[in-house]
Amino acid sequence: MNHNVLITGGAGFIGSHVVRLFVTNYPQYQIYNLDVLSYAGSLDNLTDLKNNENYTFIKGDICDNEFIKNIFKKYKISRVIHLAAESHVDRSIVDPFSFAQTNVMGTLNLLQVAKEYWQNNYVNKLFYHISTDEVYGSLGQDGLFSVNSKYDPHSPYAASKASSDHFVRSYKDTYDLPIIISNCSNNFGPNQFTEKLIPLVVNNIIHNKPIPVYGNGENIRDWIFVDDHVRAIDLIFHKGETGETYNIGGSNEMRNIDLINELITTTDSLLGRPEGTSIKLLKYVTDRPGHDFRYAIDSSKLNNQLGWKSSDNFIENIEKTVSWYIKQ
């Protein structure tokens, strides 16, 4: 079946990998990449696709109602994969209004335009909303976030994504819009903007700059390689059940300080430096306000229903990622 797929945020980190997979693997689809090209988005991530016949880039803002209406009408959009978002927690603490505008109002605008354009003819239509595990709040030493976990966001970023999730579900319950939501753990891999933990650490090691460690470095995150996340998005898009939520986790729990030490070891090695050279760059700083202690995802629903599983080669994927940043 042919689809005209609108992918929002397709010039960003995860979005660029999603766009590449869909353009490459589904030549029968027309892929429309909508991105405002903020500081974190770059068409350099997709230069190899610019001449593909089934790929079109559109520069624009998801909050612009008339603009989005024109896109749906001009390109006859039948499916949406919505990744466009402000996503950096520290920035959300400084400027929560921008996060509410993009993540909440932008999502609401897309939902409303999709509802109006599809006019209750929902056959083969889908609004697939990509979200985060941060909406669930924080875990203690034990347990996992499941699709039934209650929402308990602690940062303005998490609150904005939680609100957008609720709006997506409300359009299913109120208007019967065919929606799917997935919530994923922390991603890493090529193309990630350098404000995020892994590329920040690697770049600071490369340039001999201080490596900031929040608090005591004991906070725990569940890391997933971006290719694994994109494989899950592909499966959910094609085989997921509308109205459902799927959690996507990498099953790679690690304390921040342990991850940073691994990045130091790997980066120093790939740069030809003596082991432990960059340990001296560690700098413990005041903890982030509302810093969640631990995230960990239960992906069993996705595993059991759609046959997905994360890769087992975490260290190899870390090495791939570090190598990519060294070459930039």
Question: For the regions a protein language model found, what residue spans apply to each?
Answer:
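Residues at alpha-helix boundaries and the short loops/turns that link adjacent helices
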Residues: 40, 65, 74, 86, ...
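N-terminal Rossmann-like NAD(P)+-binding domain of SDR-like oxidoreductases, especially those catalyzing
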Residues: 1-187, 227, 256, 320-323
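Short, well-ordered secondary-structure micro-motifs
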Residues: 44, 140, 192, 224, ...
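Active-site loop immediately N-terminal to the catalytic Tyr-X3-Lys motif
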Residues: 96, 152, 194-195, 240
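Short acidic-hydrophobic sequence patches enriched in Asp/Glu that either
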Residues: 38, 193, 197, 255
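Proline-centered turn/helix-capping motifs that create local helix->coil transitions or kinks
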Residues: 119-120, 128, 137-141, 176, ...
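C-terminal substrate-binding subdomain of Rossmann-fold SDR/epimerase-dehydratase oxidoreductases
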Residues: 18, 31, 60, 109, ...
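A glycine/serine/threonine-rich, flexible loop-to-helix segment
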Residues: 143, 194-202
